[in-house]
Amino acid sequence: MNWLTTTQRQQIQEYAAKKPTEETCGFVLQGGAVIEVENVSKTPETHFEIGPSDYLHADIAGIEGVWHTHLELDGFSPLDQQVLAGDSLPWAVYCLKSGKFHQCNPNAPAPLLGRPFCFGVYDCYSLVTDKLAELGVQLPQWPRGLYGEWNQPLFKPFDDEALNVGSPVLDELYQEGDILLMNLGDHPGHTDHVGVFVDHQRFLHHPAEKESRVDRFGSWWKRKTRLVLRPTALWKS
């Protein structure tokens, strides 16, 4: 997950300090060199864009990862996350205001607790699949739609897919590996968030734009839970 070295982080901070009013960007090349390239975005104070020639030259040298900076936003932006979800390269963003780095490496396993949110790579469903993989249960990839689409009233992918992987737990005797289907948004009637039990009263989940964590399955979460499923492989015969 954290793929930058201390020296590489320091170099990125130095590049960022030279341009405090706009986003800077660049690559980490094979061998560890950190380079800055021109941000050709028409709105460099809020976005970054790398020109094709710079990308080509870096590709010839061998790209290990992509980095850029944010002036105020602490973390990957929605646009960053959409692009990252379709990319195989590690990404990093440095926030000048907070002084924090956020890193995402889709090629490396991430810890279940404390992973950063990155839609399509580190999100609520990928956390569920990773936890269940530890239990020997392989789940298919569910469609997520576009970033933020889970807040729309007609968002149904999770509900459409859920009963294909397990059956409802009706007696509230929950166990490790049971999947929670929840609605946390403004539009009831559909699932917009999922989690997974780690024991009969605590569950693991990854809220949008926050780090993954474990919460107690108290009254508030019970009200937000639409259904609990037990994967087929975990039902005792």
Sequence positions of predicted segments:
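Mid-chain, well-packed structural core segment of small domains
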Residues: 57-85, 172-197
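Conserved beta-strand-loop surface patch within small alpha/beta domains used
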Residues: 1-63, 72-107
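Second-shell loop/turn segments in exported
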Residues: 112-118
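Active-site nucleophilic cysteine motif
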Residues: 118-135
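Glycine- and charge-enriched low-complexity intrinsically disordered segments
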Residues: 215-237
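...with weaker cross-activation on analogous glycine-rich loops/strands in unrelated enzymes
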Residues: 145-212, 218
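Surface-exposed patches in mature extracellular/periplasmic domains of secreted proteins
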Residues: 139-144
